[in-house]
Amino acid sequence: MKIAIDFDDTLATYEVQRLADMLIKSEHDVHIVTSRVSNEHAQNPRWNDDLFLIAEMLSIPKEKIHFCNLTPKWKFFCDNDDFDFHIDDDAEEVDEINQHSKTKAFHFVSTFDNSGIRRIANKIENN
């Protein structure tokens, strides 16, 4: 399956990094789709160093990192309609993606006991 994961407050968290690692090891095609601006549009050319560091740590290549440059993510998923799932901490983005695109978006909420991430992992594996 082709799976997108938001970065800020999502893949930036350890629990989602563990999920991404599991998905990659299970041979899912994992991408990063972020609202952030790319380095070309950022005021600081090192703006995305944290993102690139985590992507490298997870072996997610740069060509699988998609910057939406502050436009709504649902537009990205309408233009790139081959994604099966997207995981995001922004409930509004999740609702818009589910409303306007074929991609099934899941709302990630960090929990003390990791139950939220286990619920998402189970939904992905059972589809």
How would you name each of these model-derived features?
Residues N44-N127:
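C-terminal cap/substrate-recognition subdomain and adjoining C-terminal extension
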Residues M1-T71:
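Alpha-helical substrate-recognition element adjacent to the catalytic core
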